[in-house]
């Protein structure tokens, strides 16, 4: 079985690689459905990239660092574990955000919202269609989370050599 190790500088570079990967993917995703490129496309791309970089940095540093450190401590350091962590954390965070804390909080205002599939919010509460839309979007975002986690893992970890016996 392969064992992997890392160091603080490699972990920092791994987080930076994850921020860049996630931001580029979100920026590219923002162009899906565009039929033509106008004169503001570069400004739009840079704005989306900057915002996404802030979100990914906050998520990787504030949310993912503790579970990642625990998994590392217990020797769960392979790329499949990293991908599972990226998928689960991204899905939970996005789904919780889109559903106002998994339905724990109602909207502050008596608001109703609909999309082409029907109402998603009615009087400040999510409809079944709204829950399904949130689930779908969170699932798509979790795929991006998997790619980000793989990028972090690939930059941060290296196979241990035969002489290395201690935990790092």
Predicted features and spans:
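Juxtamembrane/disordered regions of integral membrane proteins
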Residues: 1-168
């Amino acid at each position: 079985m392969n064992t992997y190790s890392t160091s603080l500088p490699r972990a920092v570079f791994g987080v930076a690689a994850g921020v860049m990967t996630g931001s580029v993917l979100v920026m590219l995703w923002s162009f899906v459905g565009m039929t033509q490129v106008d004169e503001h496309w570069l400004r739009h791309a840079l704005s989306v990239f900057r915002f996404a970089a802030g979100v990914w940095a906050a998520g990787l540093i504030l949310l993912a660092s503790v579970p990642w450190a625990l998994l590392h401590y217990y020797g769960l350091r392979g790329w499949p574990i990293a991908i599972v962590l990226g998928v689960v954390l991204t899905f939970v965070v996005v789904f919780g955000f889109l559903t106002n804390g998994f339905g724990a909080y109602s909207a502050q205002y008596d608001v109703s919202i609909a999309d082409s599939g029907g109402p998603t919010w009615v009087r400040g509460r999510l409809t079944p269609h709204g829950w399904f839309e949130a689930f779908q979007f969170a699932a798509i975002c979790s795929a991006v989370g998997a790619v980000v986690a793989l990028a972090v893992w690939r930059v941060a970890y290296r196979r241990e050599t035969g002489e290395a016996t201690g935990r790092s």
